[in-house]
């Protein structure tokens, strides 16, 4: 076989543009597959409202007065208005004062002079177009620049338990500063909003105010969310629903834990490993 015949028998590599096209198609397929898995398939698997079906169509993030997405919804209560007020009082949380000229001056004095103001006002957020129905806080340190706080909105007159259902946004105020979006003076929150959700739930359970607890889907797993002040937050995306005792009758035993679907339990375990790296 001469050299010309040998060259003819050897396969030629595909043209460069064909290889690039093939690589591009593979990359596109990977991106599409990832998008389907991350944004459609997995959320469909772990989205669940079996314990409180009336929440399935509701948004799970608050809004500022300017319409900017605010804090995520991460906690809920089951009980009437008196049940909520009694439970929060028993847990050592104080109703927040309304925002007035007097309360604004007082909170400024608390922050600047490092003096207590245990029922300082919280900034208004909106859910379903309305301001919070109730707001509570628990001091952490001397002044109002460090505090635990939560807002609640009544969203169902009658849930699965035939009692009212409230949704809330629990967060920890770590400092006072300017909003990254509007420049207004506001509190900046700690990024770990799940920790604050747990803090509130622990307080209510320790006070004997919780009959049972379970989860429903909230905003979904979020590693780099931003609230209305531009603060970063991360969350497993679940809402902890706490069924309160009725008529302030203290529960002596631990709260009943109603499990989530298996897919959600697995997702939560994976998230705990991820969140551990975010906390470092």
Residue ranges and their predicted role:
Residues 1-23:
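N-terminal Lys/Arg-rich, disordered targeting/topogenic segments
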Residues 22-44:
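Hydrophobic membrane-insertion alpha-helices, especially the h-region
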Residues 27, 31, 71-78, 142, ...:
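Short, charged/polar micro-motifs that form catalytic or ligand-binding hotspots
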Residues 32-39, 56-58, 110-115:
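A broad, low-specificity signal for short, low-complexity segments enriched in glycine/proline
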Residues 44-65:
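Compositionally biased P/S/T/G-rich terminal and signal peptide-adjacent segments
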Residues 59-85:
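Terminal, regulation- and interaction-focused segments at domain boundaries
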Residues 76-117:
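Extracytoplasmic/periplasmic/luminal assembly and interaction segments
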Residues 107-279:
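A cross-kingdom signal targeting lumenal/periplasmic-facing segments of multi-pass membrane
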């Amino acid at each position: 076989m001469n050299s010309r015949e040998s060259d003819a028998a050897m396969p030629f590599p595909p043209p460069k543009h064909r290889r690039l096209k093939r690589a591009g198609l593979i990359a596109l397929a990977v991106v599409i597959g990832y998008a389907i898995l991350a944004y459609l398939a997995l959320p469909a698997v772990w989205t669940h409202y079996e314990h409180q079906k009336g929440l399935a169509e509701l948004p799970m993030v608050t809004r500022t007065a300017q319409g900017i997405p605010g804090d995520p919804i991460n906690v809920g209560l089951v009980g009437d208005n008196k049940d909520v007020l009694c439970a929060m009082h028993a847990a050592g949380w104080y109703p927040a004062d309304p925002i007035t000229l007097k309360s604004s001056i007082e909170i400024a004095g608390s922050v600047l002079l490092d003096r207590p103001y245990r029922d300082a006002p919280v900034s208004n957020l909106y859910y379903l177009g309305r301001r919070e129905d109730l707001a509570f806080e628990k001091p952490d340190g001397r002044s109002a620049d460090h505090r635990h706080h939560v807002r609640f909105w009544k969203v169902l007159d009658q849930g699965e338990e035939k009692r009212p259902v409230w949704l809330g946004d629990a967060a920890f105020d770590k400092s006072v500063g300017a909003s990254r979006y509007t420049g207004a003076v506001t509190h900046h929150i700690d990024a770990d909003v799940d920790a604050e959700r747990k803090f509130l739930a622990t307080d209510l359970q320790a006070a004997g105010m919780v009959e049972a607890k379970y989860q429903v889907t909230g905003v979904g797993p979020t590693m780099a969310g931003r609230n209305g002040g531009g603060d970063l937050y991360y969350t497993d995306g679940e809402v902890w629903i706490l069924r309160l005792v009725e008529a302030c009758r203290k529960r002596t035993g631990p709260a009943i834990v109603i499990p989530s679907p298996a897919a959600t339990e697995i997702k939560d375990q994976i998230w705990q490993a991820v969140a551990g790296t975010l906390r470092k």
